[in-house]
């Protein structure tokens, strides 16, 4: 059995080249963040930027900010919550929640067919940060990357129906919603026009984890 040693650590400016490589490998072109946005996230809230390192290579990255979160009135979109990824205008040090701005894993971080838990490890580190900073919860706008292909194969279905579709094991049909539900997140709100994302037909789903 192969044992993989994945380390999660805070990122710094020296990691920017490696971070941008992960971004290129992890996301469709319309969903990628620019180098300037990652630089800004490192400057505004460095405690919220983590990288996953495997075999001395950065293979995953996650970024976050602090916001004032009202579960009865959550952000309408990722774009609104993050100022389109430029968090200097949305980060609120006095807020009550950690908002995950991004989480991406390169195929280099998935050497096994089912992966080795790089994304889960990055998400767990953001959970730990929420606890360390005594925030109430961890929230994010999840993509629904299976939605477009599902509609193309089975005919157009309302997004409300798609996010509620379950597999035989009871978990969501959508791979990303499934990932977050396994991690203990609950769906809060469907967000249309959350970001430019062809695979998700620009939809996102606000999900929440109580710290």
Predicted regions and their residues:
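Glycine-rich phosphate/pyrophosphate-binding loop shared by adenosine-nucleotide-utilizing enzymes
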Residues: 4-6, 57-61, 98
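Anionic, Ser/Thr-rich low-complexity intrinsically disordered regions
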Residues: 20, 26-34, 40-51, 63, ...
């Amino acid at each position: 059995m192969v044992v993989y040693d994945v380390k999660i650590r805070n990122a710094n400016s020296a990691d920017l080249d490696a971070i941008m490589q992960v971004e290129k490998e992890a996301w469709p072109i319309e969903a990628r963040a620019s180098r300037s946005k990652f630089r800004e996230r490192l400057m505004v809230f460095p405690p919220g930027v983590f990288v996953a390192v495997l075999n001395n290579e950065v293979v995953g990255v996650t970024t976050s900010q602090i916001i004032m979160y009202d579960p009865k009135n959550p952000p309408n979109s990722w774009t609104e919550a993050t100022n389109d990824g430029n968090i200097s205008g949305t980060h609120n040090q006095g807020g009550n929640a950690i908002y995950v701005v991004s989480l991406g894993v390169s195929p280099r971080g998935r050497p096994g067919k089912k992966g080795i838990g790089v994304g889960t490890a990055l998400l767990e580190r953001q959970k730990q940060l929420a606890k360390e900073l005594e925030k109430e919860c961890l929230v994010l706008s999840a993509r629904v990357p299976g939605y477009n292909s599902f509609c193309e194969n089975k005919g157009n279905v309302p997004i409300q129906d798609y996010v509620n579709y379950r597999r035989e094991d009871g978990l969501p049909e959508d791979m990303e919603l499934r990932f977050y539900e396994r991690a203990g997140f609950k769906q809060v709100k469907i967000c249309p026009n959350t970001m430019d994302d062809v695979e998700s037909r620009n939809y996102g789903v606000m999900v929440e984890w109580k710290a």
